[in-house]
Each structure stands twice: as structure tokens, then as C-alpha cells.
Amino acid sequence: MSAVNGTPWGSSAREEVWAGSGVEVEGSELPTFSTAAKVRVGVTIVLFVSSAGGNLAVLWSVTRPQPSQLRPSPVRRLFAHLAAADLLVTFVVMPLDATWNITVQWLAGDIACRTLMFLKLMAMYAAAFLPVVIGLDRQAAVLNPLGSRSGVRKLLGAAWGLSFLLALPQLFLFHTVHRAGPVPFTQCATKGSFKARWQETTYNLFTFCCLFLLPLTAMAICYSRIVLGVSSPRTRKGSHAPAGEFALRRSFDNRPRVRLRALRLALLVLLTFILCWTPYYLLGLWYWFSPSMLSEVPPSLSHILFLFGLLNAPLDPLLYGAFTLGCRRGHQELSMDSSREEGSRRMFQQDIQALRQTEVQKTVTSRKAGETKDIPITSI
């Protein structure tokens, strides 16, 4: 994450540059607060302000009391959790990254080193797992609209629980490492936690799979199933459904445009996740398998790619804001359509009632005429 911290979870080949042993330690070049790092800090501050404001606004919008006539949407609950994860990234990862680049070395002590590395990875796990939950929810909403939605809470709990458990190793791997001379220097690193190089590489690959590869695969499967399900002939033909099921399905799908917006929103969340983090993780893989490339790749490239990854946190509330505005317009159109349908229904009922009254009057008149003809004529 910083000049000495090249991956999102902190373990990097860069640590070996200054935290080695013997002659490497004495002759290594210590990191400095370079011009590229200064630009990175400035951009991080801008991202922090925009992400904090946007995600706090999303939380306020989702948690405020809603009109009684509107049923709470599952999408709102899901984006409340996504906003919470983005806020965790905002208030842990961004300030930590900016401060660490300014101080260059670690000045907060061993306990803060372990705790902040744990919180940082937990925040990034949550921000990666919650879009998967959104994809699973959209898959259930599209492919099985009549099914129960109670499983969403379990999925949300599993996402947060896994984020906590998978980040726990950070508490034991990271610690402060001190360098006595020629210039005293302290850093938060994994130096000495791995007995062999392959162990560190295995841990990095495992974290990479859990942070990026597995969530990306799960989301790709979800949206592929949605596309296949929507395009299948069975889904398009509604005439084969029983009458009762068709009526119930209409009651669930009375807002198709809102459902379509929710699906588009989930797809945009997936696309932003891919676009923001793919370049940085690919660079991390390059570092792990070819540490010599550290001297060939300019540090500014690592700065740019990580800032591009942090852009994901302020983008999510913008997507939700666009979705909310679209839903409000949809609700207005829906209310207008409902009022028109209600007026048409009342006019139809009035016409039916008038026709019935006319038929009744005709029947009464014809009966009276028949009774008059049946009266016998007597002579006086």
C-alpha cells in the first residue's frame, strides 16, 4: 500500500529491500517521501472526502424512516451493508495509506501495526464479498421471484464473518521490525513470519484468490445465470403458468422497470470492481513471481494503480444515487399509472352499473306491459 507496502494486505517483496539481514540491511536504500508519494497522498485525501460523504449519505438514505406505503427494498438493505464496507475502507485504509506515505516508517507501535493490518484486510474482504451477495440476491430475484428472500440475511452474516476470520492471520504475521543503523528505522512488516519464500507466496496467492479471483468468479456465474435465465424460452412464455401463479407473479413484478434498474445497478457494481482492482492485483502477481521487476517498474505506476483501486469506494454511492433517482421516477410513473388505472376501473364500473340499471328498467317495463294485456275486458 505504501512505498514499503506493495500489496493491499501489506506483505510485499519490497520489505526485503530494507528489512533483510546482514549486508542488505546496511546497504539498502530507505524509502523517502517522494513527489509521487505526495501526489498519492493528495489524491487519497480527495478520495477520502468524496467516499466518506457519499457513503454516509447512502447510509442516511437507507436507514431513515420510509413512508408506510412503501415496502423496504432488499436492494436498499444490501447497499447499506456495501456502504458500511466502503466506509470501513474509507476510514481505515485511506488514512492509513496517506499517513504511512507521509511518515515513511511506522511510528504507531506494535499493537497498532497488528490491529490496523487486520482491519485493513477485513475492510477489503468485506468490500469484495458484499458485491457477491448482491449478485446472489439479484439471481434469486430474477430466476425465482416467488421464492423466500430470508436467505439474504444469512449471506450478509456470512460475508462479514468470513471477512473477520480471513483477516485474523494479519494479527500474527505483522509486527514492528527495527533497524539500528546507520539510520534508525522502524517498519510494520511480515519480516520473520514466514520461514521460506514459498510460504509467503502461498499466503499471498490465497489472499489474492479470496480478495479478487473467487468473488469475481462467483459474480460472473451469477450474472451469466441471470442472462441465460432471462433469455430462455421458458422465462419468456408466461402463458404456461397457472392462473393463480400468474396473478401472484404480477403482484411481485408490478414494478418491472425498478427491477431492471436494480439488475443494472448490480452489474455496474461488478464492472467497477473489475475495472478498479484488476490492474493493481495483476501488478501484485507480477511482483510476487518476479521480484526483480521492482527495480524496473517505476513507483509512480504502483501509486496510480492503487489509487485507481481506491476509486471503487467513492463510485459505489454514485451508482446507488443514480439508482435511487431512477426509482423515484419509477415510483412517480407507477403512481400516475395506478391513478389512471383506478380512474378507468371506476368509469368501467359506473358504465356496468348504468347498463344493469337500464336492463332492470327494461325488464320491469316489459313485465308491466304483459300484465296489462292479460287483464280481461268485461262489458258494463
Swiss-Prot record:
Pfam families: 7tm_1. GO terms for biological process: cellular response to hormone stimulus. Residues 61-76, 137-160, 225-278, 324-380 are cytoplasmic. Residues 1-40, 97-114, 179-204, 298-303 are extracellular. Phosphorylated on the C-terminal cytoplasmic tail. GO terms for molecular function: G protein-coupled receptor activity; peptide binding; protein-hormone receptor activity. Disulfide bonds join 113-188. Keywords: Cell membrane, Disulfide bond, G-protein coupled receptor, Glycoprotein, Membrane, Phosphoprotein, Receptor, Transducer, Transmembrane, Transmembrane helix. Gene3D superfamilies: Rhodopsin 7-helix transmembrane proteins. Signal peptide: none annotated. Its main location: membrane. PROSITE patterns: G_PROTEIN_RECEP_F1_2 (PS50262). The chain crosses the membrane at residues 41-60, 77-96, 115-136, 161-178, 205-224, 279-297, 304-323. GO terms for cellular component: plasma membrane. It is a multi-pass membrane protein. It is found in: Cell membrane. Glycans are attached at residue 101. Belongs to the G-protein coupled receptor 1 family. This is Gonadotropin-releasing hormone II receptor. It comes from Callithrix jacchus (White-tufted-ear marmoset). The lineage of its organism: Eukaryota, Metazoa, Chordata, Craniata, Vertebrata. The gene is GNRHR2.
